[in-house]
Structure formats: C-alpha cells, structure tokens
Amino acid sequence: MAVGKRIYLKRKMPDHEVMMQFKEIPASNVADVMERSCAMNPRIRLVSSPKAQMMVGPALTIKARSGDNLALHAAIDMAQEGDVLVVSNEGDNTRALMGEIMMALLYHTKKAAGIILDGPIRDIDEIGKWDFP
C-alpha cells in the first residue's frame, strides 16, 4: 500500500549560533562547498520585496503533489518562528499550492523566516509588497 503523506513530528534542530553564521554567507558559496547538492533551481525567483533578501532558519521540508496542498497546510500548522519552509511541487506549474491567505498565516501568525516554493502561487501582486522572503 502506498503512503500518501508522511509527517515527521520530531525535528532535530540545528545549533542557533552556527545557523546564524550562515546569514552572512552567499548561497552560491554554500552550494559550491556542498558540491552543488543544495543549489536551488534557477527558475525559482524572489516574488516579494523584503528589505533583506537573505533568510536563514531550520528547514521544514514539504513534498506536495500538483494541486494538493494538504501537506503544506500540515506544515504551516507545524511551523515555528524562524522556520524556512521548502516546498517541492515537483516543478509543476499548472496549479498554485498557496496564495495570500496561507502566506499571511505563515508570515504574520507563525513568523516564519521565509518560504521557497518550486511552483506557482496566487495573489502575487499583494504578496510582492510584503517584507517576507
């Protein structure tokens, strides 16, 4: 039987001081020393206008199927202040997984550090005005 969703409730959190040191290092340098195994797809681009375009925090990773944002809802519920949500939509660009309402919950209520999503989002004109990477 195939598993449709797995949620790991226990997370090993990185040392905060070590993690904050990464805030000053360009992402390209981190990717280079990790043999480019953690480089982001170049088609993923910044859609908001944060004052600081760098973000650092513990990653909360989500793998979602096209048009199915149930796992993303669960991750937002689990998110803690300072988390960076990293969402794989497997590159699908036919259906958005989130928009202004879910993003507002993540930004204003959960106080996440940011989100990286490899698919489309709705309400980009409004979200683009926010100081949220």
Annotated model-derived regions:
Residues 2-133:
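Feature captures the catalytic cores and cofactor-binding loops of soluble hydro-lyases/lyases
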